[in-house]
Amino acid sequence: SPSLQMASFTITEKGYALTDPKGNTLTAIAADFEKGPQKPDSYLGKVVSLLYHRYLNGKLPIAMVSMDNCSHNGDKVAAAVTAFADAWCERGLAETGFAAYVRDPKAVSYPWSMIDKITPRPDAKVEKMLGADGISGLDAYVTSKHTYVAPFVNAEECEYLVIEDHFPNGRPALEKGGVIFTDRETVDKVEKMKVCTCLNPLHTALAI
C-alpha cells in the first residue's frame, strides 16, 4: 500500500541475529538464503520478502523502525535486511535492483530509537488491585528458566521513546502520544545519558 509509512519491530536484540556466536550462519537463515523471497520460514526472511514485494510493486518508500532496547538498533535491522537482499540477488532469486533499493535512504530507512520504561517483575499489589476490579486468572508463576511472569504487566510512570526522524514516506503524528522525534546524533546522546550517565547508574546504585 502506498499509504504504509513504517513497520516497527520489538523482537529483542537476538531477533536480528543471522549468525551464531562462532560466526556461522544460523540454519534457518541459511535455508532462507537459498529459498529466496517466495517462501521464507524465518521471521527476518518474511520481513525482507515483504520488502521485496513492495519493491516489485512500485519501489515504494518505508521506514523500518526497531523499538528494541539495544544500541543503534536501526543498524541491526539494516544489516539483516541487506544481508538477505544480497544473498537473494547473488543467487538470482531477486532482481538485482532490490539490493540497491534497501540501501537507498530515500526508499528504505532504518531509524535509530531509544526506549526507556522500566517494567519490573509482576507486583502482588497490582495483582490485588486488578482482582478488586473483578479481573481473575492473574496468578503469577515461575518458569523453568526461573523467570517470574504473570498475565499482567506493571511499569513505572516515567517513559521515553526517542526516534530518529527519518521517514521517507512520511510518518504518523506519534509526537501527539509523547514520542520524541529528533536527529540520529541526539538519539545516540540520549541513549548514552540513559546507559552511562543518569538513569541506569542511579538505578544500579539504588539497588545496591
Predicted feature residues:
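Substrate/ligand-engaging "lid" and interaction regions
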Residues: 1-208
